Amino acid sequence: MGDLKSGFEEVDGVRLGYLIIKGKQMFALSQVFTDLLKNIPRTTVHKRMDHLKVKKHHCDLEELRKLKAINSIAFHAAKCTLISREDVEALYTSCKTERVLKTKRRRVGRALATKAPPPERAAAASPRPAFWKDKHQLWRGLSGAARPLPISAQSQRPGAAAARPAAHLPQIFSKYPGSHYPEIVRSPCKSSLNYETAQLQGNYVAFHSDPAYFRSLLCSKHPAAAGATCLERFHLVNSFCPPPHHHHHHHHHHHHHHHRAQQPTPSHHPSHHHRPQPHLGSFPESCSSDSESSSYSDHAANDSDFGSSLSSSSNSVSSEEEEEEGEEEEEEEEEEEGGSGASDSSEISSEEEDSSTESDSSSGSSQVSVQSIRFRRTSFCKPPSVQAQANFLYHLASAAAATKPAAFEDAGRLPDLKSSVKAESPEEWSLQSWAPKGTPVYCPASLGSCFPEIRNDRVSEITFPHSEISSTVKRTDLTINCHAEGASSPSPKTNNVFPQQRILREARKCLQATPTTHCAENSTIAARFLNNDSCGTTANSGKDSKIPHCPEFATDLPSLQSDPRVDTATAAAAAAAATKAESLCTGTGDKTLPFLHNIKIKVEDSSANEEYEPELITNKLKWECNDAEGEFYNMTEKKEEDALVPTAKEGFACPEKETPSLNPLAQSQGLSCTLGSPKPEDGEYKFGARVRKNYRTLVLGKRPVLQTPPVKPNLKSARSPRPTGKTETHEGTLDDFTVLNRRKKVASNVASAVKRPFNFMANFPCPPSLIIGKDGDLWPAYSLNTTKDSQPPHKAHPIWKWQLGGSAIPLPPSHKFRKFNS
């Protein structure tokens, strides 16, 4: 170690330790990565290294220890790669230039139209020799001697700022801590495109320290003109032009305050750019705050990225971020970046600039920029992703968009349920609902077909792995499905928010979509359900056969509505939703609330008896109808919740009317009766924790309804087909019961999601696979043919686990046992 010479080189304001190996300064690649190029993606750096054919030197133990001694590498590092100073410079220049170029190239065409790139840019783009070897070296620190630029020396003079008319202009090179380095001013007006385009390749020109030269080139447009141009081109007048200079980086400007004080606003001094600018190249921070620099550098990302990006943290931040923005939102960002990323760029740029402002240090800036870039990307990508998920159908649903917006409005109108959900934008819940919710939402576009199909598919695929029985389950769990789809989808996100609210919103959205959608599809169903008011009506047998028990389910739905009626907010929303579902669905069909009545979900016994045999097919169809109905119901709920809270009462009245046919719980049972889950649980599923359950439902399928009973006080009810009276009993207490259950469920769901997921003893003694039949003989406890019992198979029944399309691999306990295997 004694013979190893080490030292420190400051590059672009970053202090790098080096070892002298074979007469060469060798820098730790890890430090170059983390400190010097920290705001540049590693992959980019590696690509540049490969492109530049950087030669790596692997440290031996002694060198490693020495590097640790000078804190160039982590003390726990087991190995280190060194690269020569030349390679560091080349890599730094390349990475910075490339980053700029990437973004700028796209803008170059536009920028070219504006101006030819200033020589400074050409120099920046020029081979690093021009940059590095020239007086203006980006590599400030590496060649400690390289720093002295006549300009930089001048820029250090307090009066220099006064001398520099363009002090307010962005400086390519921002001052390094403790000293001013020549900053090449990028004319605010100049689009980074200029830099990029053009003449970078053939026109590489070393920067002339002569300020006049730079100013003429860079500031060919006076800041005022530049400001106008900026405003015009980049919308950056605020951030790019002197004003930002005042706004954003007073922190930074404190260095420049004397300069700025001396420097008139660019608009005021058109001659500034013409004045000799010793600092043109070297304005340390003269008037460019990091913000400005970032704005400028953002546009002059080259310069900024070259030297100023690191030197002026804002520059690097905004330039890189905006570069990436530019890459991502090149055209938008050009304008927006020009405006400091007027919009997104503006946010991030502002944040970054602010952070940069706060931390003049380039490293702080760099981190900010990295994070900001990522955040920006995230934010940029996010809307697309959101839209991609939800809006892809949303566009399809744009026709139904009116409905969907209405749903959104409805969602907005849901004050009580949406209070917490309200904050979320419709798009948000579209996202939250994921595809399922998005599907209902988008289904309006497809309306009848899209929504049911997607939803059925989703429900089968998403809600329940078991597509066949799943459809039965789904059908029986329509409420849950609606919830699972509407709420379940949203549930993952909505779980924290009131899923019920989200669901209601979704439901409303879906409802709006669905009334059209399902009513379109289910108009017959609605009619049939209307016929199903008689619940037995087979006039709708076409769809009744499809949904033989839909009348029951319809009745259940009204009953369910009655249940929500008990729960004032939930009931109002649910009943209103149900009523609205009735109204909407019925409106779609016969515009009669009986639609929901007709939507009556198949009774457990029917479900149990028929669902598993012929009903499997019918069940799926029924389930689809019911699902549509349930979703209608949910959407109706949501919509009702919006507009029909009174209607909810109306719905209550209707549900009460319907309740006789099936109590709210009966309805919920109707919906989930096949699953044997009581309505309160359904309500909870819909309005409360059950929505969370819907998350599981989404994962597991509709099972949560079945599993609801174990968790719920309604367990017995859920397990056994709930008589109407029984349901009514809950209906009477449903408000309290649902609220209680919901609360319990929310609490227990939260807890159950955490602790109840696996209740060994609760799940262990699975129901016997063989039982003694009425004839005294052994009978399979479970079969697809358990029509003997009016009740659906026990929740532990394999049918719930091993349905067609279901996973043969048991679900994780958190999903498997939560209200499922009880």
From Swiss-Prot:
Residues 319-338 have a biased composition (Acidic residues). Residues 278-318 have a biased composition (Low complexity). Belongs to the DACH/dachshund family. It comes from the Eukaryota. Residues 245-261 have a biased composition (Basic residues). Keywords: Isopeptide bond, Ubl conjugation. There is a cross-link at residue 602 (Glycyl lysine isopeptide (Lys-Gly) (interchain with G-Cter in SUMO2)). It comes from Mus musculus (Mouse). Pfam families: EPOP, Ski_Sno_DHD. Residues 245-370, 658-677, 706-732 are annotated as: Disordered. Residues 660-675 have a biased composition (Polar residues). The keyword Ubl conjugation applies. This is SKI/DACH domain-containing protein 1. The keyword Ubl conjugation applies.
